[in-house]
Amino acid sequence: MKLAHHLTIRSSHLHINGQDCVALAEKYGTPLYVTSEDRVVEQFESYKKALGARYPKVQVLFAAKANGNLALMRALAAKGAGADVFSSGELNLALEAGMAPEKLLFNGSSKTPSDLKLAVEKGVKVSLDSLDELHQIDAVATAAGKKVKVSFRVNPALEVPTHPKIATGLATSKFGIPHKEIPAAYKEALVCTSILPVGIHCHIGSQILEVEPFVRAAEVMVRIAKELTEMGVKLEFIDLGGGLGIPYHHDTDPAPTAEDYAAKVIPVFKAGMEACGITPELWVEPGRSLVADSTILLTRINSTKKAHKRFANVDAGFNLLIRPAMYDSYHEVIVANKADAPLNAEYTVTGPICETGDILAPDRKLPELAAGDIIAVLDAGAYGYAMASQYNSRPRCPEVLIHGSQVALMRRGETVADLKAAMEQPPWQK
């Protein structure tokens, strides 16, 4: 199996950033998320370099929904990242991490009045998803005596090769305004009291392993930019979204890079802007491709069982990594304490949750396994802990961050006390 360079095998043990995964499991316990900060920064810098070499005004926003840990966001903020945020919670975390308000875009298809008020108060840009939202935020900004910079989210009506639940640019998607209706939306925005329409925004989907769909999205956005410029809209930024995928099947999936993306998309974008006579900032919103392969989930085998097939029952389930259950997603797995042992058996790796679908890795070629072995689930940094839950009243696990040779918790593990912390006893039960 191909491994990214921050993952190595030494003395039969899997290592991440030079740290022995078995030793980490012993020190911090399992289940345990382990993240390489250096890998996240490396991936971010690859976007900055590839895009910046081809277009002079680029802003890379981290899609905070992929992994909202403050430590990761601080590391990215230190390198100049902004963020695409989808809630007041993500907005507050991005600001606390040190991200500049002007580098934040508040996205979302169903923002609350308090979301809009917070966006205006903090001075961030807002991607509007409907005309209702336009008039709501105009009223909020007017009441506050402020102007708010906005874009509209464009639905480009593009078919993309990905799971239907994460294809966000389809004509039937809940996201955005149909691309043919965008000029009318901007006409309405131009006459609002407190609205400054300065951008356009799209996002076509996630885990896309081809560059061509992004080229088609850029073509749609260039056409819209031309129409808006002719209407008198002064575009300060055009956000092409994120969605570049990663090779979850390490040996067979294509692995388009930021360089591949830039080489195909930037010529289309740059030529379009030159034809319009404008030089807006280009914004992109990578999430998965920044953080997914930075992280592994370490989980210990509680027991093995032979029934109609062989099972390895581990202490992490879809409470901590729901992607396999939700999307039938594939994650490579390695036995961290037997990382170079012969793959002479087949197991289905299952979690502890009371659901038949709690399967992390079905029918995998693995070494002979026993209780106590440590399995590493790879590429768990995007939509892993971010989508974790306390289902079955299981406290969520800790997260560890590695920077160079330093290792530290970036989130403590929860306890039973945390499960009860927000619960109240009604007065009639006292």
What positions do the PLM features span?
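A charged N-terminal "starter" segment
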Residues: 1-149, 187, 192-196, 230-233, ...
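Short beta-strand segments
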Residues: 63, 149-155, 201-203, 239-241, ...
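Active-site-proximal loop/turn and secondary-structure-junction residues that shape catalytic pockets
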Residues: 66-68, 89, 110-112, 130-132, ...
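Short acidic, glycine/serine/threonine-rich loops at helix termini
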Residues: 73, 96-97, 116-121, 137-140, ...
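A generic local secondary-structure boundary/capping motif
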Residues: 116, 138-142, 174, 188, ...
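Charged (often Lys/Glu-rich) extended helix/loop segments that serve as interaction or gating elements
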Residues: 264, 270-273, 277-430
